[in-house]
Amino acid sequence: MVTVREAKLEDIKDIAKVHVDSWRTTYHEIIPIDYLNSLNYKEFEDKWKSRSLKGVFVAQDEKGSVFGFASFGPIRSEQEGYDGELYAIYLLEERQRQGAGRALLAKGAEFLLQHGFSSMFVWVIEQNPSIIFYQAYSPERVAEDNFEIAGVRLKEVGLGWPDLSALKTLLNR
């Protein structure tokens, strides 16, 4: 059983751990292992402490252990027709494909709608094996960009849902 709730300050340590561990498992064939191994929990904790937790949700198990999170808010780049953004969604590898990602996405869609947003956009590294998670909910492919991390040039794709209400309905089926 998964519970999705708003993140609290006490969750930051767990969020940072999920963030680092998920990067290591998700991107191990995409980003150099030396870079991934250099990621540390304390730095991620500090980054999370400096941010607002508005629009951040955690997934926890029946014992209250946090194993995933997602972060949503206003779009950060200019993408015509989109006003909301999924900034990040990460789950520990052993808890993926069990419905928590869908539950986090549904909670975020609800949050964005309640705050006056009507659409949602997300950037995804094209080589990310979890891109199929997003594709399962029929987004439009609306942008492409390239960036470099640890000396590796990567392509990211911008996926969007122009009708957030329709996405919420799909997620809540």
Swiss-Prot record:
The keyword Hydrolase does not apply. Its EC number is 2.3.1.-. It holds the Pfam family Acetyltransf_1. One of its GO terms (molecular function) is acyltransferase activity, transferring groups other than amino-acyl groups. The keyword Acyltransferase applies. Residues 2-171 form the N-acetyltransferase domain. CDD domains: NAT_SF. InterPro entries: Acyl_CoA_acyltransferase, GNAT_dom. SUPFAM superfamilies: Acyl-CoA N-acyltransferases (Nat) (SSF55729). Keywords: Acyltransferase, Transferase. It comes from the Bacteria. Belongs to the acetyltransferase family. This is Uncharacterized N-acetyltransferase YuaI.
